[in-house]
Regions:
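Long, acidic/serine-threonine-rich intrinsically disordered regions with weak helical/coil propensity
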Residues: 197-204, 257-381, 387, 556, ...
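Single conserved hydrophobic/aromatic residue that forms the stacking wall/gate
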Residues: 1-12
Length: 667
């Protein structure tokens, strides 16, 4: 510990002496570490060096001497892995425990944060952008989404500065507008991860306008099947980039000949692509042939993919939504301009095609091909990373888990179980065991993991069909956040002792597990014990406020206690997270009907004050979670007192009469 402290002290001392050039070099080192982490866990190919050797060579005095007889530095690697994962736990949500070299991400986050606090960081306009990117990568390895925080607002300010620079420098306006488009797009993706789809949609449209992308979703006559004789109107996306559709990007992106493998449909009825007939139209894109449109800039392709995701997130999943998304994907996949962009397009197409019998086979094989290509070096690293931050590309383990989910959908449960076991995604593995009629085996699996019972790997393979030796790991090797999730999973499975297991999860996490608090709140809510349900759900939303169902149950519990102001605050948060939640709107109206003027005025005043102060979720997980006192919605901008001092009734009225809620929807 002492050598390590001296090493960090030297680093901080040097940071105080940075000049502009040195600050830029430090930023470059942080970005390199961030991209090395991304390369290992997202884009591939695998690196030829490991983080432990690199850190040892950079600061040998900060690490204990290595055993010369050992083939690998396993002890140091395990210690760094555990410490890094503990650092990356945020708002009670653990990072994926099998991610590669998390110390690289920790290093990047710490260096970027130190630069932001240093006076030299002011002279680095792009520092804000890289902090947002690092935070986005961090949040994408967490089990559940969390708030990004105020750093997103600074990226919005940077986008505004880029727009003004485009207006002031006419000769370089295209370059400035391109940067503005990227900033708007990445901010929109971050908001979309938090569930703010409406705000994200506006940013995606603004990104398209900034980069000069023109697009229109329209209809054109065409044929979709091989034996179709008469043309019918087909949905098509007409899109055109500014200028020649590539400018300086074209040579850079098309120079790489290797692109992700696109599997053919090979169906005896459906055509590979819709055959369109050119027809006259009055739109600005009337000059485009629907079946032979020009290539798009890769950035414009990223915008269209983001809009496609936004359609899925804001509309119910039915045939019309699928057709609309397919039109966007067909336009992007028509021209392979970049490895990562094309991979993202193929991934989204696979998700859509899994819903149809005729295309499910290609969807599964295509996803398998995407998983297999990750570790290969068949394309340049620069090309894979160039547009990574402008995409919602899944990490390696998430794509493998998605493949397992497709196997499970097709009924290939044993293959799905093998993948889940290899990835140590125990919740999904237990679900597969239940579908195989082996629910008790799932309970035993989780219990073995928590209590560290020794089971040989070959026994695990034979008896539980899971090719992993993770069950040999003793409990102390689990991080507190991960152990808490396992206890919650055991509570889900062992219903008779659920409350005991959830409480154990809360204690193990040192009062930082949103999952445990949500589970306890839901358990008491199902029992009709609304007072403890309110307390636990309030703890849950203070730690992580992005779960609509937690807010909804909190509002219903407050209605059961006739605390109308608290209930209204919770339902307002529900409607802010999901504007189409009709039950929350209904219950919100019911709360307002039962509030007197003083209560309504207090609610409005508190919300306005919170909005003026820019209230948001506190980033310190431990401090927010360890408090025993509860508040309705700290990060929703609402903090109110109880409506009455006298004890509230223990259960709500069932109908609309009397003093009970007019609409009490529990699900």
């Amino acid at each position: 510990d002492q050598p390590r402290s001296r090493g960090l002290g030297d680093v901080y001392k040097r940071q105080r002496e940075l000049d502009a050039d040195a600050a830029l070099e430090v930023l470059a080192v942080a970005v390199s570490a961030l991209h090395a982490f991304v390369q290992l866990n997202w884009t591939g190919p695998d690196l030829s060096w490991d983080a432990q050797s690199l850190l040892r060579s950079a600061a040998p005095s900060s690490f204990p001497p290595r055993d010369p007889e050992a083939e690998t530095d396993a002890e140091l690697q395990n210690a760094m892995q555990a410490a890094s994962l503990e650092f990356l736990t945020k708002q009670g949500e653990p990072a994926y425990h099998l991610c590669e070299a998390p110390v690289l991400l920790v290093f990047a986050l710490l260096v970027l944060e130190a630069l932001a606090k240093h006076s030299a960081g002011v002279r680095l306009p792009s520092l804000v952008w890289w902090r947002v990117r690092a935070a986005a990568v961090h949040h994408r390895i967490l089990d559940e989404p969390v708030r990004t925080g105020s750093v997103l607002d600074t990226l919005g300010e940077l986008a505004g500065r880029l727009g003004r620079a485009a207006a002031e420098h006419a000769d370089e306006a295209d370059a400035w507008r391109h940067l503005q488009s990227r900033a708007l797009l990445e901010r929109g993706l971050a908001l979309q991860r938090e569930g703010l789809e409406r705000d994200a949609s506006e940013l995606f449209v603004a990104a398209a306008q900034a980069n000069g992308l023109e697009y229109e979703l329209t209809g054109a006559p065409g044929k979709r099947t091989r034996y179709q004789k008469h043309e019918t109107t087909q949905l098509v996306l007409l899109a055109e980039s500014r200028g020649d559709g590539g400018s300086g990007e074209r040579a850079a992106d098309e120079a790489s000949a290797k692109q992700p493998t696109t599997l053919a449909l090979n169906d005896d009825t459906l055509l590979e692509h819709t055959e369109f007939t050119r027809t006259s139209t009055t739109s600005r894109l009337a000059h485009l042939d629907p079946g032979a449109q020009p290539p798009l800039q890769p950035t414009d392709q990223c915008v269209l993919l983001a809009l496609c995701l936004n359609i899925r997130n804001t509309q119910p999943m039915h045939g019309l939504t699928t057709s609309e998304m397919a039109a966007f994907l067909e336009r992007v996949l028509a021209h392979a301009r970049n490895w990562s962009v094309h991979t993202m397009g193929l991934l989204l197409r696979s998700r859509l095609e899994m819903q149809r019998t005729r295309t499910a086979e290609r969807a599964t094989l295509q996803l398998q091909a995407l998983v297999d290509q990750m570790p290969t070096a068949d394309s340049h690293v620069e090309e894979r990373l160039r547009y990574f931050h402008a995409l919602e590309l899944e990490p390696r383990w998430a794509m493998q888990a998605e493949l397992a989910e497709q196997y499970a959908t097709l009924g290939v449960l044993r293959s799905a179980l093998e993948i889940y076991g290899r990835l140590q995604l125990w919740e999904d593995a237990v679900r597969c065991l239940a579908l195989l009629g082996r629910a008790q085996e799932g309970i035993e699996l989780v219990d073995d993991l928590l209590h560290g019972r020794k089971v040989e790997a070959d026994v695990v393979m034979q008896q539980k069909r899971i090719a992993t030796s993770a069950s040999q790991v003793r409990p102390e090797h689990f991080s507190s956040a991960r152990a808490a999730k396992l206890w919650c999973l055991l509570g889900d499975l062992d219903v008779a002792h659920a409350e005991e297991h959830y409480q154990r999860a809360w204690d193990v996490s040192q009062r930082t597990s949103s999952r445990a608090a949500r589970s306890l709140g839901g358990l008491y809510f199902a029992k009709g014990e609304y007072r403890p349900a309110c307390e636990w759900l309030q703890r849950a939303v203070r730690i992580n406020a992005l779960f609509v169902r937690s807010w909804f149950m909190l509002g219903c519990s407050a209605m059961g206690l006739e605390r109308w102001v608290d209930a209204a605050a919770a339902f307002r948060k529900c409607t802010a997270l999901d504007e189409d939640d009709g039950e929350s709107w209904n219950n919100l109206a019911s709360c307002y009907l039962r509030m007197d003027e003083t209560q309504a005025a207090r609610l409005e005043a508190v919300e306005r004050a919170a909005e003026d102060d820019g209230a948001s979720l506190a980033s310190d997980d431990a401090s927010t979670a360890s408090a025993d006192t509860t508040s309705t919605a700290r990060d929703s901008g609402v903090e109110v007192e109880s409506d009455a001092d006298e004890p509230a009734p223990a259960a709500p009225a069932a109908g609309g009469g009397g003093g009970g809620p007019a609409s009490f929807h529990t699900f």
